[in-house]
Amino acid sequence: MNLNDITFLLSVHGLDQLPEDGLPEFAFAGRSNVGKSSLMNTLLRRSGFVKVSGRPGKTQGLNFFQAAEDCMLVDLPGYGFARVSKEMQNNWQKLITSYISEREALKCVVVIIDIRHEPKALDRQLLDWLREQKVPVLPIYTKIDKLSGNQLSRHAAILDAGHGIKKDERILFSSKTGQGRDELIAVLESYLA
């Protein structure tokens, strides 16, 4: 997978705008402010390429990034943020739900969860729904550099239990240190083989 040659392709606000090139797609989902953009920038080794915002709700469409001729990375709007209108939240939910359930090019949804917080109902609902839809899912616990070793193990175990995740089914990730990047690339590449 060539992540050195990455370009922003387009922002999609309706299913009729989806690219039709047939490249494999990997979607990145997570609650607002869990470190989704930072994770994507670390993955690409390009600081600031995917816009990072301290303001939740910044991503408002499905943002497609093309990695050479290999695949697409799709940045989904963050969920669970209350400062946008209910109508906007509903529109995002419909768009994301339709995209995930209908898109044949979608190979895996990377679900990003902040390890510092207790299990959230919205994360569990998304994980359960993806499993029901038979969509491959890769949970990633971010911001691991913010916890000590003992805290990290305890928080990971709590999230695993709360979300029905086995230890070998998820990745611990730090955008600050890059830990987990190689594991993430290996999993994504396994879908391209």
Curated annotation (Swiss-Prot):
Look up the record and give one Gene Ontology term from the biological process aspect: division septum assembly
So which cofactors does this thing need? Mg(2+)
InterPro entries named among the record's database cross-references: G_ENGB_dom (IPR030393), GTP-bd (IPR006073), GTP-bd_ribosome_bio_YsxC (IPR019987), P-loop_NTPase (IPR027417)
Instruction: Tell me which GO cellular component terms the UniProt record holds.
Output: cytosol
Q: Which residues form the EngB-type G domain?
A: 22-193
The keyword Phosphoprotein is annotated on this UniProt entry: no
Say yes or no: keyword GTP-binding present: yes
Q: Spell out the molecular function terms from Gene Ontology.
A: GTP binding; metal ion binding
Keywords assigned: Cell cycle, Cell division, GTP-binding, Magnesium, Metal-binding, Nucleotide-binding, Septation
**SUPFAM superfamilies, alphabetized:** P-loop containing nucleoside triphosphate hydrolases
Residues that bind GTP, according to the entry?
A: 30-37, 57-61, 75-78, 142-145, 173-175
Query: Pfam families given for it?
Result: MMR_HSR1
Chain sites annotated for binding Mg(2+):
37, 59
Q: Which HAMAP family match?
A: GTPase_EngB (MF_00321)
What does this gene product do? Necessary for normal cell division and for the maintenance of normal septation.
Query: Belongs to which family?
Result: Belongs to the TRAFAC class TrmE-Era-EngA-EngB-Septin-like GTPase superfamily. EngB GTPase family.
This one is known as: Probable GTP-binding protein EngB
